């Protein structure tokens, strides 16, 4: 049997193999359903930073402040001292989404950070808001960040396309690879089911304000953190994307169609990490759906299989603080887990 491949097909096959082998190494490490390895160390309620073990809710409140500070200092980087968001443009994309069962709006948000008293740094991104039309009163909402631009996440020709498009455009083998790697509902949510169950859906493409690329991402993080002088604890994109979730909620609290006390975050992989981060630092969120959040997310640094601190910080130097990278090969030294 004789096979013939064009140069384009050979290149596509090579890219597919690289994507898949990287995916196996980084995101498909198997997990034992009955693990017997040690738990988190130090224990969340045990002695920590010279403090005795937690014995009541009041002591837990004090402990949680210490833990959040430690995660900023050693893993994710430091959050802004002050920040906020405002809607600078809003338009109705369609009032007949899903055969008239929902309406779709596009909001442009301007968000800002301040790491000192003198500097204010801004960025903008678009938010899609799909709300059911035949439901009385404010509705609960699922808020998600995705790998694909908004026009790929909710398919409607009226949705704005970001400059440069995105990795989810096109047809053929690479589009198939994207779907295979990320799954049906990672990039394109089950919108009809969400709306039919009485939920609203809001989605954003976080690469609009912090690109998921090493050089471009680090440059954006630097611009947004002007006023922060310690490069070792400058925030990474996981913290910035998580912060972005909170800025969306700043806007949603004034949205009459949304019950801002019932907003649930959703994210896969890196955006699962961001969703967990956001919920840990912002108590306004009602819940989190973090799918395969892995290292730097729900997985422990110590006693784990698959992706290590060294693996993830070398492959994605923009995701975490530079301080986290210093724990490569010595995960037991990370003060929190």
Predicted region positions:
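Bacterial N-terminal signal peptides
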Residues: 11-22
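N-terminal targeting or regulatory segments adjacent to alpha/beta-hydrolase or S9 domains
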Residues: 23-125, 134, 155-159
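Short beta-strand-to-loop junctions in surface cap/lid or active-site-entrance loops
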Residues: 126-137, 146-147
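Short beta-strand immediately N-terminal to the catalytic nucleophile in serine-hydrolase-like folds
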Residues: 143, 265-267, 291
């Amino acid at each position: 049997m004789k096979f013939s491949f064009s140069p384009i097909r050979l290149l596509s096959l090579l890219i597919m193999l690289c994507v898949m082998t990287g995916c196996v190494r980084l995101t498909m490490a198997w997990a034992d359903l009955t693990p017997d390895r040690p738990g988190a160390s130090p224990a969340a309620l045990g002695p920590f930073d010279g403090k005795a073990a937690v014995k009541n809710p009041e002591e837990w409140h004090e402990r949680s402040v210490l833990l959040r500070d430690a995660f900023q200092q050693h893993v994710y980087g430091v959050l802004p001292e002050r920040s906020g968001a405002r809607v600078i443009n809003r338009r109705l994309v369609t009032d007949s989404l899903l055969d008239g069962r929902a309406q779709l709006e596009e909001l442009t948000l301007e968000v800002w950070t301040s790491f000192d008293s003198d500097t204010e740094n801004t960025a903008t991104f678009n938010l899609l808001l799909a709300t059911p039309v035949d439901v009385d009163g404010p509705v609960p909402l699922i808020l998600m960040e995705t790998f694909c631009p908004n026009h790929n996440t909710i398919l409607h020709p009226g949705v704005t396309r970001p400059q440069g498009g995105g990795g989810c455009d096109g047809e053929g083998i690479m589009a198939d690879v994207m779907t295979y790697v990320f799954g049906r509902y990672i990039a394109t949510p089950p919108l009809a089911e969400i709306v039919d169950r009485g939920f609203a859906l809001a989605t954003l493409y976080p690469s609009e304000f912090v690109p998921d690329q090493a050089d471009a991402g680090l440059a954006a993080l630097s611009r947004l953190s002007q006023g922060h002088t310690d490069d070792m604890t400058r925030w990474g994109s996981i913290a910035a994307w998580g912060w972005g979730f909170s800025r969306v909620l700043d806007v949603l609290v004034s949205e009459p169609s949304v019950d801002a006390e019932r907003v649930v975050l959703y994210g896969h992989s890196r955006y699962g990490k961001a969703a967990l981060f956001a919920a840990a630092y912002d108590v306004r969120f009602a819940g989190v759906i973090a799918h395969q959040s892995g290292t730097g997310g729900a997985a422990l640094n110590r006693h784990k299989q698959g992706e290590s601190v060294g693996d993830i910080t070398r492959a994605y130097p923009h995701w975490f603080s530079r301080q986290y990278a210093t724990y490569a090969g010595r995960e037991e030294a990370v003060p929190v887990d």
